Amino acid sequence: MGIFCSVIKFENLQDLRRLCHWGPIIALGVIAICSTMAMIDSVLWYWPLHTTGGSVNFIMLINWTVMILYNYFNAMFAGPGFVPRGWKPEKSQDSMYLQYCKVCQAYKAPRSHHCRKCNRCVMKMDHHCPWINNCCGHQNHASFTLFLLLAPLGCTHAAFIFVMTMYTQLYNRLSFGWNTVKIDMSAARRDPPPIVPFGLAAFAATLFALGLALGTTIAVGMLFFIQIKIILRNKTSIESWIEEKAKDRIQYYQLDEVFIFPYDMGSKWKNFKQVFTWSGVPEGDGLEWPIREGCDQYSLTIEQLKQKADKRVRSVRYKVIEDYNGACCPLNRGVRTFFTSPCTEEPRIRLQKGEFILATRGLRYWLYGDKILDDSFIEGTSRVRGWFPRNCVEKCPCDGDSDPAPEGEKKNR
């Protein structure tokens, strides 16, 4: 549904710099190795083209490669869709329900979030994917999910070719002795013999490609099921986190209210159709969304504003007592700090003795917060935020006994 309906816009191809990143280089390398080796193994050593089955098999391999690459590049270059710079709601009074992004100089539309990597506010942002070096969001969610489906299917087909090639080529070449196993790599397995013999180099290349194909099938297949779960609930991973924090906030303050997620249409099929359409274009403009009964366009954004206000209330001021160079895993801060470094792409921030930090959340040995640079921090115009070790700072006496609890303990408070 919609696999070939959406078209990569030509003007977006100017951004070829997205290919110059370790994610696309590895992803395209794996696709190239698996598809090329599968075709070579099929034609030369397993299923020759002069047979009907061999021709059908070869066409299927080409088809997998084309569909995988199409959806991959569509997800990369079409992009997730960005909130227009300077955007604001049609009704000026509605701006009170929205957060303002000072980087984009625009209000954050419902379901949009600012991506530090893309440096833009992304429509219905799910996450920034390093493998496509772009965000997964409103406009490319379908292509991204189809890529996650087609890649494991194509790799499963390729893995079958690799296994059968090695089996058919080695079956008559093994000789077992009392203490040894010998392989005669010069023995021919096909009649007529292949143009290129299946030697040690071909065996090693096929075995390597098999490992890549199986690894891709498992890893990317798991990502596909995660995305399908997100689509059927019509709830991105970020929105799942917001909903979890909403329940935590209500429980923490023992409030008499219930948070209802506004974008779950109550039917998996209806949620599915929000992303996958026959035209290949997702439903909606990325700024306004269909909502369930009893909610409005700003139900989620109002909850986000409540959480932001709550975060300010629960934040704790710290003073830096030891320098920190911003290393991801600083061994000089202790073994426990080294091995419990947060597994996230969020940055670490350099600290100098005497600076002040406003911490908003934390782990057992790490804290996350904003460096208080000057008075402009209060206005939100200047922010340097990230993770830093707990043992580099001490709590300011004016903040009493409050302390950002480790994230795993928040629900027990």
From Swiss-Prot:
Keywords: Acyltransferase, Endoplasmic reticulum, Lipoprotein, Membrane, Palmitate, SH3 domain, Transferase, Transmembrane, Transmembrane helix
Lipid moiety-binding residues (S-palmitoyl cysteine): C328, C329, C343
Catalytic site: C129 (s-palmitoyl cysteine intermediate)
Domain SH3 as annotated: residue spans: 313-398
EC number annotated for this UniProt entry: 2.3.1.225, 2.3.1.-
Domain DHHC residue range list: 99-149
Annotated compartments: Endoplasmic reticulum membrane
Transmembrane stretches, start-end: 25-45, 58-78, 144-164, 195-215
Membrane topology designation: Multi-pass membrane protein
Gene Ontology CC terms, in alphabetical order: endoplasmic reticulum; endoplasmic reticulum membrane
InterPro entries documented for this protein: Palmitoyltrfase_DHHC (IPR001594), PFA4/ZDH16/20/ERF2-like (IPR039859), SH3-like_dom_sf (IPR036028), SH3_domain (IPR001452)
Post-translational modification: Palmitoylated at 3 different sites by ZDHHC16. The combination of the different palmitoylation events strongly affects the quaternary assembly of ZDHHC6, its localization, stability and function. Palmitoylation at Cys-328 accelerates the turnover of ZDHHC6. Depalmitoylated by LYPLA2.
Cytoplasmic side: 1-24, 79-143, 216-413
A Pfam family the protein falls into: DHHC
Alphabetical GO biological process terms: positive regulation of mitochondrial fusion; protein palmitoylation; protein stearoylation
Any one GO molecular function term: protein-cysteine S-palmitoyltransferase activity
Catalysed reactions, semicolon-separated: L-cysteinyl-[protein] + hexadecanoyl-CoA = S-hexadecanoyl-L-cysteinyl-[protein] + CoA; L-cysteinyl-[protein] + octadecanoyl-CoA = S-octadecanoyl-L-cysteinyl-[protein] + CoA
Quaternary structure note: Homooligomerizes. Interacts with SELENOK.
PANTHER family assigned: PALMITOYLTRANSFERASE ZDHHC16
Comment field on protein domains: The DHHC domain is required for palmitoyltransferase activity. The C-terminal di-lysine motif confers endoplasmic reticulum localization.
Function: Endoplasmic reticulum palmitoyl acyltransferase that mediates palmitoylation of proteins such as AMFR, CALX, ITPR1 and TFRC. Palmitoylates calnexin (CALX), which is required for its association with the ribosome-translocon complex and efficient folding of glycosylated proteins. Mediates palmitoylation of AMFR, promoting AMFR distribution to the peripheral endoplasmic reticulum. Together with SELENOK, palmitoylates ITPR1 in immune cells, leading to regulate ITPR1 stability and function.
Family as reported in the entry's similarity comment: Belongs to the DHHC palmitoyltransferase family.
Name of the protein: Palmitoyltransferase ZDHHC6
Organism whose genome encodes this protein: Mus musculus
Gene: Zdhhc6
